[in-house]
Amino acid sequence: MHSWQTTRFQIDLSRPRIMGIVNVTPDSFSDGGRHASASAALRHCEQLLREGADVLDIGGESTRPGSPPVPLAEELARVRPVLQGALKLGAPVSIDTCKPEVMAEALEMGVDIINDIWALRRGQAQAVVAAHPRCGVCLMHMHGEPATMQQAPMPGGPGEAVAAVADFLRERSQTLHALGVARERIVIDPGIGFGKTPEQNLALLARQRELLAATGAPLLAGWSRKSTLGLLLADEGQPPPAPGERISASVAAALIAVQRGAALVRVHDVAATAQALKVWAAVQALSGSQS
């Protein structure tokens, strides 16, 4: 599949696309509080687009490990003005939420994509999406729930985790398709860091093509500043570097994901990722003539 059908845009996936993260939260693991006001968040949206983002992913509830749920009214108050402004910027807009009520209001506003860490398993979420004629949807795998997921990650080894994630994403994709959601509207996300050990996360990257083969759907890779990268970077006996100090590792993971077939990468550091992908694309364009 070479495109992603969304509300207002048919996103061309013949080349990797960048989803820029816009956290309208005081407590996100990497940049909580930096863009908590609507004006700051909209300035950040504009900056990400200048840096090369293809999609804006706006969220009003942190999903970091251990994070508590945000009341519905508070989440809506956070994201509503940002969505209103972002929809005027001429780029696809995604709402990162697990609440059906937020999804429904966002879609009424004209939002292009629903990005749900619960893969539409809560309440009337899948009915909200199925009732919409065109919106895109990203289905993510998560073991457990954000408040406790890293206290009891997925059982089994790396290989068992890859198989379980593939089965889950296949089942969710098939369920939505049976409800009338066209395949070209669906993207999958293995959920790096959502109830998984570092070894399981790395296996999902190393064996990413198995997820693509299992579902036939485009894949969104979300490695940006994740704790697994911090553990890999930590010197012996030292704490991992802070999330903002994991940029090079995040770009490396994004490139590996793209090399293994990811259609989109969800990142905080758009400029660095866009530069790296330009180099990758230039080499890819010549690789056929040198084979």
Task: Identify the function of each model-found stretch.
Residues 13, 30-44, 63-85, 89, ...:
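Active-site-adjacent loop and "lid" segments of alpha/beta metabolic enzymes
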Residues 43-59, 260:
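Catalytic domains of carbohydrate-active enzymes, especially glycoside hydrolases
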Residues 1-16:
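SAM-dependent methyltransferases
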Residues 182-185:
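Short acidic capping loops at alpha-helix termini that bridge into adjacent secondary structure
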